[in-house]
């Protein structure tokens, strides 16, 4: 089993995504459900993180960035085998071009 660490940007992504649903779309119940769904999906990564595919982008895959899915969102993460830790990097809507955001991160 792996330890899961959320990077600050991933936490901020979850807040931004749920705030948008709650306040812009005026659906606070849906936002709460979304937040809980993100947390549950991320918690499950600790058991078998390698079952998730590497990103289809060659540069991201070369950096061993993997992704999981929840609804219309991708959860990007990196596995550090030395410490048995999964680092959740970003939680982004599928329409967001994640590549520049992920390549600018220090791994």
Regions found by a protein language model. Give the residues of each.
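Enriched for short, Lys/Arg-rich terminal
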Residues: 70-107
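Basic, Lys/Arg-enriched alpha-helical interface segments
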Residues: 1-64
């Amino acid at each position: 089993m792996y330890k899961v660490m959320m990077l600050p940007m991933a936490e901020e992504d979850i807040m931004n995504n749920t705030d948008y649903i709650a306040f812009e779309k005026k659906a606070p119940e849906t936002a709460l459900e979304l937040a809980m769904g993100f947390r549950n999906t991320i918690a499950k990564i600790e058991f078998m993180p390698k079952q998730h595919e590497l990103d289809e982008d060659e540069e991201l895959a070369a950096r061993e960035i993997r992704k999981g899915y929840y609804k219309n969102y991708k959860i990007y993460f990196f596995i550090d085998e030395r410490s048995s830790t999964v680092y959740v990097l970003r939680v982004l809507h599928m329409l967001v071009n994640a590549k520049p955001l992920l390549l600018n991160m220090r791994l």
